[in-house]
Amino acid sequence: MKKNSDDKLFPASLTKVLTAIVALDNIENLHKKITISEKDIEGLAEANASVAGLEAGEQVTLEDLLYALILPSGADGANALANHLNGSIPNFVKDMNKKAAGMGMLHTHFTNTTGLHDKQHYTTLQDIKKMMDHAWKNPAFRKVMTTLRYTIPATKQHPNGLKLESTLLFYDDDLKFSGGEIIGGKSGFTPEAGYCLISVARMKDGQQYMVISAKAKKIEKTLVEEGGSATEYGNVMDAKAIYTAIADEKNK
């Protein structure tokens, strides 16, 4: 089922799926340690970007950065991967656009690693599907995307470790439905993009399905007690309803 699949849209943090793809293409050793620099985190607070909480001088592994990128949607993780793998963010973004073109994402152009708004940073639902189909084939990506919680081991800056939690899997039991459960995904938001969501569900028969949505408007009424947002929760429940309908149809 496709609706408005070729309409131009701003992807917000769904961008970070491609950031992860390109990073994994360039990572030879997930356990290699790097040191977070000032340039990895500069400007992020001013841009109101979502971050994992990494600090300059902190030593973490490239695997830690992937979790920081995907679970809390950390722009600091995105920029650190770009700077340390490709030497600079612009160099990394060039690889992102090259990778997108190679995957057949013909209506996509990215200008940053994070999804922060830029008029020249755009894609389509159809291209996002191509991106996610490619990413999901990578075992390392699937492992990160389906993780609920992860703790970066203790550092000088975080003596008790840095605890990370998935923005999507936060809803935990709400992700289960009679025919299966939502096992992973990525959410995103900017005022210009609206609320965006990629989710993947596994049915009881083992088959997997994907739902992608974008441009959802903000809901003022609070639907969740803590964390997340009403609209993000609504997006997740809409996806759950679609998966439930698929499961019901399969059981007929």
Language-model segments: what does each one mean?
Residues 87-252:
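Penicillin-recognizing serine hydrolase domain
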Residues 1-126, 135-136:
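Active-site-adjacent loops and short helices of periplasmic peptidoglycan-processing enzymes
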